């Protein structure tokens, strides 16, 4: 009887733990980024002789859509990148560029990511685009049903990847208006494979006010 009670108790505890892991109760809440915070981020080009510049250059004239990639080798990140790339013809029509930032360069990970993301990619060494407060998902991600659903969807879409590089710091997607227009959309991953809604991205992009030479001087 005692062993039976212990067994039932253990199963019950495991069930409760599984239930709690699949709520958002224990997920760290993202803190919204201010435009001034993003503007001051130092980015590097990925050339042999890299150029360092302030991130605001990316959106100053025409706004921008920016993906903060959790890990280029992750098949879930590659699936989200492909989602964003499906918007590229419409973004080009609207005159809004699409960029990505990565937090590290590991082997050929960035090069191997480029078939899924054909926009320009920059290095954010200080991981500022992943802040202001970096959020991590550790092994709890392995028992979240949402992660399993996201994984199945990506696998079913034919995406594959590897385990190279840091992948616990969660990424996101930003739509930023031109000049001082501000952040029009800020999507922060709450779990692995939590993709932004492409329609939400397009809706935000349509609000961008492109700067003409005259408005840029005003």
UniProtKB/Swiss-Prot annotation:
**What is a GO molecular function of this protein?**
antioxidant activity
- What positions does UniProt annotate as the active site of this protein? 74 (redox-active), 77 (redox-active)
Residues covered by region (Thioredoxin-like fold): 3-101
InterPro entries noted in UniProt: PXL2A/B/C, Thioredoxin-like_sf
GO CC aspect terms: extracellular region; mitochondrion
- Extract the Pfam families matched here: AhpC-TSA_2
Q: Which family does it belong to?
A: Belongs to the peroxiredoxin-like PRXL2 family. PRXL2A subfamily.
**Other notes:** The active site cysteines correspond to the redox-active cysteines of peroxiredoxins.
Q: What is this protein called?
A: Peroxiredoxin-like 2A
Q: Give the gene name.
A: Prxl2a
């Amino acid at each position: 009887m005692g062993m039976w009670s212990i067994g039932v108790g253990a199963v019950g505890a495991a069930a409760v733990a599984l239930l709690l892991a699949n709520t958002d109760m224990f997920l760290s809440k993202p803190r919204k980024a201010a435009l001034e915070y993003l503007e001051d981020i130092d980015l590097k080009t990925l050339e042999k002789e890299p150029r360092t510049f302030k991130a605001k250059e990316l959106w100053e004239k025409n706004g921008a859509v920016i993906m903060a990639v959790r890990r280029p080798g992750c098949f879930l990140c590659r699936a989200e990148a492909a989602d964003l790339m499906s918007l590229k013809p419409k973004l080009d029509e609207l005159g809004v560029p699409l960029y990505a930032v990565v937090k590290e360069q590991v082997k050929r990970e960035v090069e191997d990511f480029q078939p899924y993301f054909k926009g320009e990619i920059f290095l954010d060494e200080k991981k500022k685009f992943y802040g202001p407060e970096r959020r991590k998902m550790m092994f709890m991600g392995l028992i979240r049903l949402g992660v399993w659903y996201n994984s199945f969807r990506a696998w079913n879409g034919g995406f594959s990847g590897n385990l190279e590089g840091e992948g616990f710091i969660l990424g996101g997607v930003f739509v930023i208006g031109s000049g001082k227009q501000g952040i029009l959309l800020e999507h922060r991953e709450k779990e692995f494979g939590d993709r932004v809604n492409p329609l939400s991205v397009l809706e935000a992009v349509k609000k961008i006010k492109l700067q003409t030479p005259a408005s840029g001087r005003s």
